From Swiss-Prot:
Name of a matching Pfam family: PH_8
Biological process (GO), any one: intermembrane lipid transfer
Compositionally biased region (Basic and acidic residues): 482-499
Protein name: Oxysterol-binding protein homolog C23H4.01c
Record keywords: Cytoplasm, Lipid transport, Lipid-binding, Phosphoprotein, Transport
Family statement: Belongs to the OSBP family.
Domain PH: 149-243
Compartmental location: Cytoplasm
Compositionally skewed regions (Polar residues) per UniProt: 460-470
Residue numbers bearing the Phosphoserine modification: 288, 419, 421, 503
UniProt region (Disordered), positions on chain: 396-555, 846-894
Source lineage: Eukaryota, Fungi, Dikarya, Ascomycota, Taphrinomycotina
Length: 945
């Protein structure tokens, strides 16, 4: 072997005479960074050589000081009579490169080492070139490598890190052996800018836009190919590289996996059978008009053994369902125990399926190959036609769950009710087998949703199961708002907060009712019976002062400090999300158990928790105002500091739903209304005597495989009473560890606050975390004055706790200008809420008999959810969704456009802004909300529930 050094900005040529019908082979290893090589053929009709002094040598060096070194070197090769015979690849220092190529026509060949892309660094290469006769089949001009090509390289468009900067051309290399993809600024650059192992990444593609998305969980690359052929080439290469990495990591015997999987399915079948009997017993009691005995066979349930001791435990539960209190108590206890076991089993199955799927994710049998020319059709749940059916009850001779496993599923997910333990069960059944497949005509209170799965026992989809075994056929009155009763059952199942990942109208659950539910009292009657939520009666109109902030000022009112404990863990909907990679997931349906008792309108109001920052900004010196406004902007993210807040999502409002918030202790009033359904747009307005705040958020969320990107389009505008105006756009946030691990939300990159009056600008930078560092909380705020100079003062701290006013010249802290407020007691059991958020859904003396019928506090399904009454929350949620679909369908038939009641768009109308956020919505000045509230005239409000 031979070792040479290729200087920077140079080409080194190794000459070799090769006989006809030979095989030219090479082995080379670069000791530092990388080198590129090509093979050229010397034309016979050209007598000139590169350099007269090198005419009798076997090696030549080309060196040029021109700016475009590579192009100059290629021109010299061409001028010397050399034509490209074989285009090589970039060889990295980590792996040696070897290969061979068939030479049909003999002659003089040049093996060219290319280091023109390196400006200062020479490269040392050890290589071996051999030419041997080849007696195999003649394949002219074809490469006969002993192994597949190790490096795939080319140019792709990569979305820039900063928001709104579009795509940039980058040079990518895919190492097929290592299973890694990396990129450089351009083809001639030797500085690697990023590298992702494919073994830990989730890859999604879109044929229509030629997109390739690579999500490692830490960073996300949004790539785009120039042509369809280029897109297919990269998809093929990525699929092969990922398959090779996946197959190399299979260390578990296949038979052991299959045996373990079958054992889990068997355990689940027997557990499911007992739960079905509980449901059968409950429905039988309700259905039977006359009292009779109902016998239930003995059920034997074998629980999974300890992983270390490998011991099996048998539990025999004998249930005799008779019309007596003792049977009901026993059945309830058994159901609660089985529910807890099902939850643990679900977590184990989910992890097992996740590991198993990683090995089969790229196989043709489990999904469509990436290199095929296909189109993915993503449906909006609002457009998905829900199937409504009247279903009968379980018969006494219903088939057992063991028999049900043999039949294929002919319908989608089922939402069932079972005991008062509120057990969340996940079940995906579209192409998979189901334990309830043969009962689709005998099940009560069942709702369908769509989900595609190819695994025979796919991880369970989001379903809420909650009812009481001995409950009567009549719905109980709505629980009081102030109820703070805590349940002893405390379980956690990770989920994620998508801000608005599911619209009530965007659910594909069917609005199915049993015969008993039809006879239940209406929702409005239940609300009246509860004597807590009531629609006010019209009062005598009163004149309104346009300059007042009615109903402020107001005497101080008492507010609660917490909400009822949320005892039912949220289900995991990874099986749904993973089928929507790269798409907006705001339309994905989810059961009510996955919601926290908070609405998106109320979440918007949480931005004003630290409104005192704006009060101080109005009163302080002009050069300090922007620091307080920046602190206010940072405080908007602090409500997500407890990680429990990231495992559930908020309720999405109905079209026309409103929410008011009057804080007499903070001297401001707030109003929000959902003004558009598609795209989802919320109009918000708040005002006090010191400032006016306006925001029209347009939330968009996308799932990238391991993380969820949360974007809130629409500018925030702030006008202080002193005349200064500010505006800013919220940065993107990422929900990390969606697939597995502890979930958390963190803001990404930076945001800018502009002083529209002076031209000053505050730049808020959120520090990025590393691969193993977890959530990053550090934040730095610097101010650039209108003259371009940076202010020596800045803000430093954490968006989860505090911000300090710091003088960088002196290196001391001037004062702490912002600190977070308190969380509720035991936040892990109360959705991780702040005390401010817990007070949102409460009806105080300020709101009593004053709210419009569209206010979120009067929404019955959310109220039931707050009080853990999932039995009534789920059907009410489905009913509200169905009614909204009917209203919108009727408006479309009559060609009627929805007009918001309290907000109007700005002068721009319906025109899209540059960022796609749409028009800015302003509060109406005439016949506005606060005048109607003062006069209690709500006749123009739509009926939503």
């Amino acid at each position: 072997m031979e070792t040479v050094e290729i200087r920077s900005k140079s080409l080194l040529i190794q000459w070799l005479t090769v006989e006809s019908n030979s095989l030219l082979s090479w082995q080379l290893h670069v000791k530092r960074k990388s080198i590129k090589f090509d093979i050229y053929h010397k034309k016979n009709d050209t007598s000139s050589l590169l350099d007269g002094s090198n005419k009798n040598t076997d090696r030549s060096i080309l060196h040029t000081k021109r700016q475009h070194t590579h192009e100059a070197g290629i021109k010299k090769l061409s001028a010397a009579g050399l034509e490209l015979f074989y285009q090589g690849e970039r060889c990295m220092s980590e792996k040696p490169s070897e290969g061979s190529v068939y030479i049909e026509n003999g002659g003089l060949y040049a093996f060219v080492f290319d280091n023109t892309f390196s400006k200062t660094k020479p490269k040392t290469v050890t290589f071996l070139l051999t030419a041997q006769p080849y007696n195999g089949p003649r394949i002219p001009n074809a490469s006969v490598h002993g192994s597949p090509k190790q490096i795939i390289s080319g140019t792709l468009l990569k979305k820039r890190r900063k928001k709104g900067q579009g795509y940039a051309r980058r040079y990518f290399t895919l190492n097929m052996v290592e299973g890694t993809i990396s990129y450089y600024a351009n083809e001639n650059s030797s500085v690697m800018r990023g590298k992702i192992p494919l073994s830990i990444a989730v890859i999604s593609v879109a044929a229509e836009t030629h997109e390739i998305n690579v999500d490692s969980g830490v960073e996300l690359w949004n790539l785009r190919a120039h042509t369809h052929q280029d897109w297919l080439r990269w998809c093929n290469a990525l699929e092969k590289a990922k398959n090779s990495q996946t197959s190399s990591k299979l260390v578990v015997d296949e038979r052991t996996q299959e045996s373990s999987s079958n054992q889990l399915v068997s355990i689940y079948s027997r557990l499911r059978e007992c739960l079905d009997i509980a449901q059968l017993y409950r429905t039988s009691r309700i259905k039977s008009a006359s009292s009779h005995n109902f016998s239930v066979p003995e059920i034997r349930i074998q629980l999974p053994g300890d992983a270390k001791e490998n011991k099996e435990t048998r539990t025999s539960v004998e249930i005799t369902a008779a019309e007596n209190a003792q049977a009901a108590v026993t059945l309830r206890k058994v159901t609660r125990q089985l529910g807890s076991l099902l939850h643990e089993l679900e977590c184990f199955i989910q992890h097992h399926e996740y590991t198993k799927e990683r090995t089969a994710q790229s196989s043709p049998s489990s999904r469509m190959s990436m290199d095929s020319n296909f189109e993915q059709h993503w449906y909006d749940a609002e457009d998905y036609e829900s199937t409504t059916s009247q279903l009968n009850h379980y018969s006494e001779s219903g088939a057992h769950a063991a028999d049900a496993t043999k039949s294929s599923v002919a319908h989608n997910e089922k939402v069932e009710d079972i005991s008062d333990s509120d057990i969340p069960i996940m079940k995906t059944s579209s192409n998979s087998t189901s334990l309830d497949a043969d009962r689709d005509s005998d099940t009560s209170s069942i709702s369908d949703t769509s989900s595609n799965s190819s695994a025979p026992h796919e991880q369970l989809n989001a379903t809420s199961l909650a009812s009481t075994v001995d409950e009567s056929s009549r719905s109980p009155p709505l629980p009081e708002v102030e109820s703070n009763k805590e349940n002893d059952i405390k379980r956690k199942q990770p989920f994620h907060d998508l801000m608005d990942s599911s619209s009530p109208d965007d659910s594909s659950f069917a609005n199915a009712k049993s015969d008993e539910e039809v006879q239940k009292p209406s929702v409005s009657k239940n609300i009246a019976d509860g004597a807590v939520i009531s629609i006010p009666k019209p009062l005598t109109p009163k004149p309104s002062d346009s300059n007042s902030l009615y109903p402020l000022p107001h005497s101080k009112v008492g507010r609660r400090k917490n909400i009822p404990a949320i005892t039912v863990p949220p289900p995991s909907i990874l099986s749904i999300l993973r089928k929507n990679i790269g798409k907006d997931i705001s339309s994905i349906p989810a059961p009510v158990v996955s919601n926290e008792p908070c609405n998106l309108l109320q979440r918007c109001a949480e931005d004003l928790e630290y409104s005192n920052m704006l009060d101080k900004a109005n009163e302080c010196d002009d050069d300090i105002k922007i620091f307080y406004v920046a602190a206010f902007a940072v405080s908007n993210f602090s409500n997500m500091r407890h990680k429990e807040r990231s495992v559930r999502k908020v309720f999405s409002p109905l079209l026309g739903e409103t929410f008011e918030l009057v804080r007499e202790d903070r001297n401001y009033r707030f109003l929000a209304e959902k003004v558009c359904h598609r795209p989802l747009i919320i109009a918000c307005h708040a005002e006090s005597r010191n400032w006016i705040w306006n925001h029209s958020p347009k939330p968009i969320q996308k799932f990238w495989g391991k993380s969820v990107e949360l974007n809130t389009l629409g500018p925030v505008t702030i006008k202080l009473a002193c005349g200064t105006e500010f505006s800013f756009m919220k940065p993107a946030c990422f929900l990390k560890n969606v697939a597995i691990g502890e979930k958390y939300v963190e803001p990404y990159d930076h945001m800018e606050i502009v002083d529209e009056t002076t031209g000053d600008k505050a730049v808020i930078r959120f520090k990025s975390g590393g691969m193993f560092s977890g959530r990053s909380e550090d934040v730095l705020v610097t101010v650039i004055r209108s003259n371009g100079e940076e202010d020596p003062k800045c803000l430093q701290g954490k968006w989860t706790s505090h911000l300090d006013f710091v003088n960088t010249d002196e290196g001391n802290v001037i004062e702490r200008i912002w600190e977070v407020g308190p969380l509720v007691d035991k936040p892990e059991d109360h959705c991780g809420m702040t005390v401010f958020a817990a007070q949102m859904n409460e009806i105080t003396d300020l709101e009593k008999d004053k709210l419009p019928p569209t206010d979120t506090r009067l929404r019955p399904d959310q109220r039931y959810r707050e009080n853990n009454d999932l039995d009534h929350a789920e059907p009410l949620k489905l009913e509200l969704e169905q009614k909204q679909r009917e209203r919108r369908k009727e408006m479309e038939e009559k060609d009627i456009k929805w007009e918001p009641r309290w907000f109007v768009p700005s002068v721009a109308g319906d025109d899209e802004d540059e960022d796609g956020s749409g028009p800015i919505w302003q509060l109406k000045k005439e016949n506005n909300y606060w005048e109607s509230r003062e006069n209690s005239t709500w006749s123009s409000c739509p009926k939503l529930w």
